[in-house]
Amino acid sequence: VLAYCREKGYYLQLYVGDSILIKQENDCSRMYTKISGIQTTAIGDALYHTDEEPYKILVMTKSEEFAEVWQQFKQDFAGKLDVTSSKDNFLELMEPGVNKWEAVKSVAASYGVQPQEIMCIGDSNNDVKMIANAGIGVAVANAKDSVKQNAKIITASNNDDGVAMVIESILTPQAAE
């Protein structure tokens, strides 16, 4: 994957432990830090030769290229990577079976909570498996269509307190009446 990204000239970030590794600081890394508030660590060409095992690789593309790049990754790495996105130009690459739903399910199981007892709320493509499998899958109004199509409930936008509204309605059923 790293050689493929280097050959194609894609900006990428490796998520290793508590660090996000990049080749060099540039407009993409600055945009990511501005959006997320998380700092990256530039390591030069060592990025392509690291012995570290990343749990996620983020590839940033231009918005107009995103759909094509996504499909290319899905085709070229079918069965080898799960390919999803969190923003219109953020492509997330992980090992098959590594996703938000598997993480939620694992934590819930450690507390004896069954999948049908779980409520998950989301808005992006990387939330689809979580929303589709949770007992109560909720999409906010400003979610991607793929999330809404898999949700049992669509609440108000996250900008209009949709998350708080749906949690309150579940915890206090009379509030919905």
Give the predicted meaning of each segment:
Residues 4-121, 130:
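Conserved acidic, metal-coordinating active-site core of Asp-based
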Residues 92-177:
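Mg2+-dependent phosphoryl-transfer enzymes with acidic/Ser/Thr/Gly-rich catalytic loops
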